[in-house]
C-alpha cells in the first residue's frame, strides 16, 4: 500500500490501476479479518470529521462503523450542523477542521468543494459523494463484482449501466472502467449520456487496459452477454414534479425488469443498485410515483428483479463499509504503508 499515506481520495482517475487494485485487495482483507474476528485496529486515537451537506444512510453508517472498528472517533456534521460555505468559507473551514481532525469526509454538492477542502485542510480528505463523482460507491461495486465472479479479471467482465448515465454514478463508472479494463456499456437515451470529453478520455484508458466503453440507446444490443446490470434512481425528492414526468417519459424503456435480464442471454447475470431503490410503493416517493405515473411494480427496477436471486444489492451495501475502511486505513495508517 505504499504511496497512499496522507493522500486524498477525491476521484478514481487520481489513481493508477495498480493503486486501485491494491485498495480492493486491502478491502477484501479487512472484510475477511472482520468476519473471522482477527481485525486489528490501526486508527486508534485518530479523529475523523464527517461533513454531510446531503444526508445518507449507507455512507454515514459505513464511515462510522469502519472508523469504530479501527479505533477512530468521529464527529458528524449534518446539513444543519456546520457553517461550511454559509457563515464560513470552504477554505477557512478546511483550515479549522484540519487542525482538529486527522481526516475529513465530505458528501455534498460540487466537486470543487471537496477539492478546496483537500487543498487547504492539510489532512486526507475523502469524497463521499459530489454532484460529479461517487468514487467510494464504485470501490464497493468493484469488490462486489470480484466476489461474484472470482474466476474472472475485470477485463473479462461486462457491466451494463441502464438509465440516466449523466450523473455522478455514470462519471465514476467511466473512471472505474478506464482503470480496470471493464467492458462497460452505458445503455441510455442520448439525452442521458455523460459529457463526451470524459467518455473519450476514459474509453482510451479502458482500451489500453484491455476493456472498452460503449454508449447505446439500443437496450437489446447493449445488454447482450452482460455479467452485471446496474441502475440508479431516476428522480430525487428535491426535484420539481415537472422534472419527474419528463425523466420518467425519457427513461421508462430503460427500466431493469425480467425482460431486460433475459435479453442478456446470461442465466447468471446479476443485478446491482447503489440504493436507495424505488422498486415498490413502500416509500413516500415510491408511493407518489405509483399514484401519479402508474409505476406500481417499481420505477428504475421492478420489485421482481430487486427481490430475485440475481439481486446482489445488499452485498454492495455491506461492501461500502469495507471499502471505505480500506480508504481510511490506507490514507491514515503508517502501519499499513
Swiss-Prot record:
Q: Might you report a single GO cellular component term?
A: cytoplasm
> Which one GO biological process term can you cite for this protein?
citrulline biosynthetic process
Binding-site residues for carbamoyl phosphate, renumbered to this chain = 56-59, 83, 107, 134-137, 274-275, 320
| EC code | 2.1.3.3
A GO molecular-function descriptor: amino acid binding
EC top class, as a word: transferase
Is Cytoplasm found in the keyword set? yes
What reaction gets catalysed by this protein? carbamoyl phosphate + L-ornithine = L-citrulline + phosphate + H(+)
Q: Which UniProt keywords apply?
A: Amino-acid biosynthesis, Arginine biosynthesis, Cytoplasm, Transferase
**Chief subcellular site?**
cytoplasm
> What exactly does this protein do?
Reversibly catalyzes the transfer of the carbamoyl group from carbamoyl phosphate (CP) to the N(epsilon) atom of ornithine (ORN) to produce L-citrulline.
NCBIfam families in alphabetical order: orni_carb_tr (TIGR00658), PRK04284.1 (NF003286), PRK12562.1 (NF009213)
Protein name as it appears in the record: Ornithine carbamoyltransferase
Q: Which organism is it from?
A: Escherichia coli O139:H28 (strain E24377A / ETEC)
What gene codes for this chain? argI
Amino acid at each position: 500500500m505504499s504511496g497512499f499515506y496522507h493522500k486524498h481520495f477525491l476521484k478514481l482517475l487520481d489513481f493508477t490501476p495498480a493503486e486501485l487494485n491494491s485498495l480492493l485487495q486491502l478491502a477484501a482483507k479487512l472484510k475477511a479479518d472482520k468476519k473471522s474476528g482477527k481485525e486489528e485496529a490501526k486508527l486508534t486515537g485518530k479523529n475523523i470529521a464527517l461533513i454531510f451537506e446531503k444526508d445518507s444512510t449507507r455512507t454515514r453508517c459505513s464511515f462510522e462503523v469502519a472508523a469504530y472498528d479501527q479505533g477512530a472517533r468521529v464527529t458528524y456534521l449534518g446539513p444543519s450542523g456546520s457553517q461550511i460555505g454559509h457563515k464560513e468559507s470552504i477554505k477557512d473551514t478546511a483550515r479549522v477542521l484540519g487542525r482538529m481532525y486527522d481526516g475529513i469526509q465530505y458528501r455534498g454538492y460540487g466537486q470543487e468543494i471537496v477539492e478546496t477542502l483537500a487543498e487547504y485542510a492539510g489532512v486526507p480528505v475523502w469524497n463521499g459523494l459530489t454532484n460529479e463523482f461517487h468514487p467510494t460507491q464504485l470501490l464497493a461495486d468493484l469488490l462486489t463484482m470480484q466476489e461474484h465472479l472470482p474466476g474472472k479479471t475485470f477485463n473479462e467482465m461486462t457491466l451494463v449501466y441502464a438509465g440516466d448515465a449523466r450523473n455522478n454514478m455514470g462519471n465514476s463508472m467511466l473512471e472505474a472502467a478506464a482503470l480496470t479494463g471493464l467492458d462497460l456499456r452505458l445503455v441510455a437515451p442520448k439525452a442521458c449520456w455523460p459529457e463526451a470529453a470524459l467518455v473519450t478520455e476514459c474509453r482510451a484508458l479502458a482500451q489500453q487496459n484491455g476493456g472498452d466503453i460503449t454508449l447505446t440507446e439500443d437496450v437489446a444490443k447493449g445488454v447482450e452477454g452482460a455479467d452485471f446490470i446496474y441502475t440508479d434512481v431516476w428522480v430525487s425528492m428535491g426535484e420539481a414534479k415537472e422534472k419527474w414526468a419528463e425523466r420518467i417519459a425519457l427513461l421508462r424503456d430503460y427500466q431493469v425488469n425480467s425482460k431486460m435480464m433475459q435479453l442478456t442471454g446470461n442465466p447468471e447475470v446479476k443485478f446491482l443498485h447503489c440504493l436507495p431503490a424505488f422498486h415498490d410503493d413502500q416509500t413516500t416517493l415510491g408511493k407518489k410515483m405509483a399514484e401519479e405515473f402508474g409505476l406500481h411494480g417499481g420505477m428504475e427496477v421492478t420489485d421482481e428483479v430487486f427481490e430475485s436471486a440475481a439481486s446482489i444489492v445488499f452485498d454492495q451495501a455491506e461492501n461500502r463499509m469495507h471499502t471505505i475502511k480500506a480508504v481510511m486505513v490506507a490514507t491514515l495508517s503508517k502501519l499499513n504503508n
